[in-house]
């Protein structure tokens, strides 16, 4: 335990939390422009062609964002919204594309978990 005199000379340093999504600058989402849309392979033991986009954000950051759902309409110069959330089997991918916002269309014919994929309610 530190003495009062020690604390007067050098106060306790506050704990600093490190963020997992530094490019968001404490915002819930950020807008950006796709600079490259491509597929990449996950790390072992998984195997797939995961759809990702390289995005230049409005604050100048350039990040890699995962495009969830089956099929997408993104290409270079598409304006998209990204949110936090990493993809465990893709190293360096710490952001998700928000489906159904700005230039990114929602997933067509999606019936369940529609809100996560920007899909409208089907006409019963």
UniProtKB/Swiss-Prot annotation:
Q: Which InterPro entries match?
A: NA-bd_OB-fold, Ribosomal_uS12, Ribosomal_uS12_bac
What would be the name of the gene that encodes this protein?
rpsL
Q: Which organism is it from?
A: Shewanella oneidensis (strain ATCC 700550 / JCM 31522 / CIP 106686 / LMG 19005 / NCIMB 14063 / MR-1)
PTM 3-methylthioaspartic acid: list the residues.
Answer: 89
Under the subunit heading, UniProt states:
Part of the 30S ribosomal subunit. Contacts proteins S8 and S17. May interact with IF1 in the 30S initiation complex.
Q: Indicate what this protein is called per its UniProt record.
A: Small ribosomal subunit protein uS12
Q: What does this protein do?
A: With S4 and S5 plays an important role in translational accuracy. Interacts with and stabilizes bases of the 16S rRNA that are involved in tRNA selection in the A site and with the mRNA backbone. Located at the interface of the 30S and 50S subunits, it traverses the body of the 30S subunit contacting proteins on the other side and probably holding the rRNA structure together. The combined cluster of proteins S8, S12 and S17 appears to hold together the shoulder and platform of the 30S subunit.
Extract the signal peptide range.
none
* Coiled coil regions, renumbered to chain: none
């Amino acid at each position: 335990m530190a003495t009062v005199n020690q604390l007067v000379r050098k106060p306790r340093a506050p704990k600093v939390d490190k963020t997992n999504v530094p490019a968001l600058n404490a915002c819930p989402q950020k807008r950006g422009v796709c600079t490259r849309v491509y597929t990449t392979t996950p790390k072992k033991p998984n195997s797939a062609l995961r759809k990702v986009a390289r995005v230049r954000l409005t604050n100048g950051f350039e990040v890699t964002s995962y495009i969830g759902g089956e099929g997408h309409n993104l290409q270079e110069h598409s304006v998209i919204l990204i949110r936090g959330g990493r993809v465990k089997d893709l190293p360096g991918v710490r952001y998700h594309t928000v489906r159904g916002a700005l230039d990114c269309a929602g997933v067509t014919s999606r019936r369940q978990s529609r809100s996560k994929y920007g899909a409208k309610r089907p006409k019963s």
